[in-house]
Amino acid sequence: MARIAGVNIPTAKRVPIALTYIHGIGNHVAEQICDAVGIDRARRVNQLSDAEVLAIREYIDANVTVEGDLRRETSMNIKRLMDLGCYRGLRHRRGLPVRGQRTHTNARTRKGPAKAIAGKKK
């Protein structure tokens, strides 16, 4: 297995598909990487030479934010919003939907399981 950006990518798959196993690389970026390095998109990972794998690894290290760095950057952006006290930060803090979705009904994924209300008894 080829190891790129700390991830073992599958050897039997085509190169662009295998690169999407890395957090932060989707289909479009994977195809851009193949074009930039000069690797045919139809080739499989087990057909790549060590030099080609090294070229992919160097290109990703230089041009793409992936894995731990991307996760850290995302969490720091959310923390910054919470520290600012802006509306989006408050929604993150309270565990509610951030992007304007309704919360009267639905939003159970973000709010967690329904809580029982000690309400009126019949």
Swiss-Prot record:
GO terms for cellular component: cytosol; small ribosomal subunit. The keyword Cell inner membrane does not apply. It comes from the Bacteria. It holds the Pfam family Ribosomal_S13. Keywords: Ribonucleoprotein, Ribosomal protein, RNA-binding, rRNA-binding, tRNA-binding. One of its GO terms (molecular function) is rRNA binding. Residues 99-122 are annotated as: Disordered. GO terms for biological process: translation. The keyword Isomerase does not apply. Belongs to the universal ribosomal protein uS13 family. Located at the top of the head of the 30S subunit, it contacts several helices of the 16S rRNA. In the 70S ribosome it contacts the 23S rRNA (bridge B1a) and protein L5 of the 50S subunit (bridge B1b), connecting the 2 subunits; these bridges are implicated in subunit movement. Contacts the tRNAs in the A and P-sites. Part of the 30S ribosomal subunit. Forms a loose heterodimer with protein S19. Forms two bridges to the 50S subunit in the 70S ribosome. This is Small ribosomal subunit protein uS13.
